[in-house]
């Protein structure tokens, strides 16, 4: 197309390369100037600047950042070392105070122990007095109930039996007396008749016997009959029962004896308890007071120094490694960059030939030559599409995301992430050494706990000896009397049983009631007394006191528990302050430095990620813009689209229309070229037509509006070198109309 009017260049004029051409109207560019010198850099000049390529510079910047981080970490570790040594001194002082804590706590604990013993003994005294009195009255009540119950049963049984026996005997005696007299009279009459008859018989016998000088005595039964007639039971047959009835025991003697015997040991025990425990006071001077302790584990201990020295050596080693690796990487980066520069130079030389071909957009040619790799990436991505419009959009999106500014943002973000990675590796190496310091500090804590344990065990052993002696004294002076009283009470019960048995033996011994009465006594009283004796025997066997002994870890249990592995909260350790993340102040200093560096690395990582996201956003903007035009139909001339350029027509200023597709032409006359059919989309192909001579075309009023619609133009170098009929330097393809850049 033709511009509406000629313009003036806004850039300095270029060298007149085309002035040496055989045909200045051809527009072909001479490859080299006549003297062989070029204003642009050659291959050797380009290779001389390989060492300042972007990757080497970025790696060197990463190295500088890592060295700064290592120096900062080393300075922080030096500060942490001073703070750790100060904290170690504080821990040493605190450990000495804790190790001396038994000295201060023992006085209060001793007072607490003594007061507890005194209160316990006072309560024991009151309990003993109440128990002794209660047992005394209970035993007396039970015994009184037993023997009075037995007395009632005994009286009921004996008196009832005696009354029944006496009545039966009296009735039997009266019956026998009356019956025996009648029987005696009847027997006397019969015997008198028999005696008369028998005497008559004897008289006859005597008559015969007198002849021989002998005589037979006569039978005389009168005296026996008289005795039989006067026979009767004696009146003293029930005197024994009457005597038994009137002589039943009342056990008053047993009661008085029992009361006296049973109360004696109880009263004696109460008297001894009052005398011994009236105002019991524990001797506090017997309880020990441990001496103060002075711990020293910072002086002469190089654990902390060796830890920080190892950290410093680690940082220095890491610094050397990073210097070596990054410098080698930066140096090695020059090799591929040199090879890339060589390929770029060759590619530029090859693609510079595209300038000679009029079938290409000159701006595209400049882009391909100046940005060979990004242009090649765009062309490769666009090759997946068959539509030329979409190919152009894909290349445009790639070019938008790979501009020098966009790539600078991307490289800056990648370099930042690489720097953060190096710092992270250094930080991880330092964090791995923290357990060594924790082990050293753990040894300090163990020393404090061991000192506390020894002091606590020594104090507990001495205090337990005093408590054991007090237990023995109370068991002998108080519960010894309880044992004595239980033995005496058992003896008293035995005496009561023996005394009662003696009374029953004296009263009913040899009678039919003795066995039943003894069975009733054994059932009613004997078994109960045996139960009481068993209870007294149990009291005798278990009547002793044992005050609890003090554990050996009284003063060290809390400190040992705070540093144990079972503690879930690190700040519970006695070496740490409330809210600390670790179990001691020394490790907390190192952790604080590590957290500080970690926060810095995290911040830098976030910043680098944000920078990369900015590049991603830029790339997305290009992709979204390309996608928005991906399915838009090409507009015709009547719809605001551009007109098809079929001929090369130049104006007086030297501008000609550049076709974007191949225009086959076998004629040399531009005016006689046939108009080709419009293609569906422009393609970047080499034109096979020859360059025709430009001719002046009148400038119409519509040319300026056509130029605004976006027609591409290529300046004809031959005519561009002439200004007012004279040779002139080549001007820029950018023209200015009334101070307006087009």
Swiss-Prot record:
The chain crosses the membrane at residues 55-75, 138-158, 321-341, 396-418, 604-624. GO terms for biological process: plasma membrane fusion involved in cytogamy. Residues 76-137, 342-395, 625-742 are cytoplasmic. It is found in: Cell membrane. The keyword Transmembrane applies. It is a multi-pass membrane protein. The keyword Iron-sulfur does not apply. Keywords: Cell membrane, Conjugation, Glycoprotein, Membrane, Transmembrane, Transmembrane helix. Residues 1-54, 159-320, 419-603 are extracellular. One of its GO terms (cellular component) is plasma membrane. Coiled coil: none annotated. InterPro entries: PRM1 (IPR026777). Glycans are attached at residues 177, 222, 245, 256, 274, 454, 483, 490, 505, 552, 566. Its main location: membrane. Belongs to the PRM1 family. Involved in cell fusion during mating by stabilizing the plasma membrane fusion event. This is Plasma membrane fusion protein prm1. It comes from Neosartorya fischeri (strain ATCC 1020 / DSM 3700 / CBS 544.65 / FGSC A1164 / JCM 1740 / NRRL 181 / WB 181) (Aspergillus fischerianus). The gene is prm1.
């Amino acid at each position: 197309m033709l511009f509406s009017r000629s313009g003036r260049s806004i850039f300095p004029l270029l060298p007149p390369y085309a002035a040496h051409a055989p045909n200045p109207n051809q527009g072909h560019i001479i490859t080299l100037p006549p003297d062989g010198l070029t204003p642009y850099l050659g291959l050797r000049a380009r290779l001389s600047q390989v060492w300042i390529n972007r990757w080497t510079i970025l790696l060197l910047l990463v190295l500088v950042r890592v060295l700064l981080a290592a120096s900062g970490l080393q300075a922080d570790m030096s500060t942490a070392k001073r703070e750790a040594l100060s904290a170690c001194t504080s821990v040493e002082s605190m450990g000495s105070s804790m190790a001396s804590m038994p000295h201060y706590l023992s006085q209060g604990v001793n007072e607490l122990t003594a007061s507890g013993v005194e209160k316990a003994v006072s309560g024991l005294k009151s309990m003993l007095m109440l128990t002794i009195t209660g047992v005394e009255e209970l035993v007396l009540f039970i015994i009184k109930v037993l023997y009075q119950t037995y007395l009632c049963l005994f009286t009921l049984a004996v008196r009832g039996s005696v009354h029944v026996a006496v009545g039966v005997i009296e009735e039997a005696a009266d019956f026998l007396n009356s019956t025996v007299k009648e029987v005696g009279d009847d027997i006397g009459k019969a015997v008198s008749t028999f005696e008369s008859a028998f005497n008559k018989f004897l008289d006859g016998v005597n008559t015969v016997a007198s002849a021989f000088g002998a005589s037979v005595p006569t039978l005389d039964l009168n005296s026996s009959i008289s005795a039989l007639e006067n026979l009767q039971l004696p009146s003293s047959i029930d005197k024994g029962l009457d005597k038994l009835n009137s002589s039943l025991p009342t056990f008053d003697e047993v009661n008085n004896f029992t009361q006296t015997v049973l109360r004696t040991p109880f009263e004696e025990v109460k008297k001894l308890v009052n005398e011994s425990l009236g105002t019991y006071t524990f001797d506090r001077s017997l309880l020990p007071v441990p001496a103060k302790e002075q711990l020293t584990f910072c002086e002469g201990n190089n654990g902390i120094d060796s830890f920080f020295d190892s950290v410093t050596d680690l940082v220095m080693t890491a610094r050397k490694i990073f210097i070596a690796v990054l410098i080698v990487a930066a140096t090695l980066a020059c090799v591929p960059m040199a090879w890339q520069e060589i390929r770029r130079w060759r590619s530029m030389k090859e693609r510079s030939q595209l300038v000679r071909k009029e079938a290409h957009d000159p701006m595209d040619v400049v882009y391909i030559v100046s940005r060979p790799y990004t242009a090649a990436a765009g062309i490769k991505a666009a090759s997946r599409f068959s539509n030329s419009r979409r190919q152009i959009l894909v290349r445009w999106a790639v070019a938008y995301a790979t501009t020098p500014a966009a790539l600078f943002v991307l490289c800056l973000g990648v370099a930042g992430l690489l720097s953060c990675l190096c710092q992270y590796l250094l930080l991880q190496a330092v964090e791995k050494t923290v357990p060594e310091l924790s082990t050293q500090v753990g040894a300090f804590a163990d020393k404090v706990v061991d000192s506390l344990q020894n002091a606590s065990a020594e104090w507990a052993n001495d205090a337990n000896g005093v408590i054991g002696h007090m237990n023995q004294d109370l068991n002998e002076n108080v519960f010894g009397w309880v044992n004595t009283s239980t033995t005496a009470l058992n003896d008293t019960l035995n005496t009561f049983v023996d005394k009662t048995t003696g009374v029953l033996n004296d009263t009913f011994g040899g009678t039919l009631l003795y066995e039943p009465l003894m069975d009733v006594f054994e059932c009613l009283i004997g078994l109960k007394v045996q139960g009481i004796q068993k209870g007294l025997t149990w009291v005798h066997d278990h009547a002793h006191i044992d005050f609890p002994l003090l554990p050996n870890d009284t003063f060290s249990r809390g400190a040992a528990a705070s540093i144990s592995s079972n503690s879930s909260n690190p700040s519970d350790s006695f070496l740490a302050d409330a809210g600390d993340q670790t179990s001691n102040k020394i490790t907390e200093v190192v952790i604080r430095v590590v957290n500080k560096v970690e926060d810095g690395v995290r911040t830098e990582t976030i910043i680098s990620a944000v920078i990369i996201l900015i590049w991603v956003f830029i790339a997305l903007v290009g992709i979204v813009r390309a996608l928005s035009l991906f399915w838009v139909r090409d507009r015709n001339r009547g719809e605001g689209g551009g007109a098809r350029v079929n001929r090369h027509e130049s104006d007086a200023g030297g501008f000609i229309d550049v076709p974007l597709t191949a225009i086959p032409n076998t004629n040399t006359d531009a005016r006689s070229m046939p108009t080709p059919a419009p293609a569906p989309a422009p393609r970047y192909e080499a034109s096979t037509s020859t360059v025709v001579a430009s001719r002046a075309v009148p400038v119409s009023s519509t040319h300026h509006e056509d130029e605004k619609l976006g027609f591409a133009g290529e300046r004809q170098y031959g005519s561009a070198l002439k200004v007012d009929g004279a040779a002139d330097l080549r001007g820029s393809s950018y023209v200015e109309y009334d101070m307006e850049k087009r």
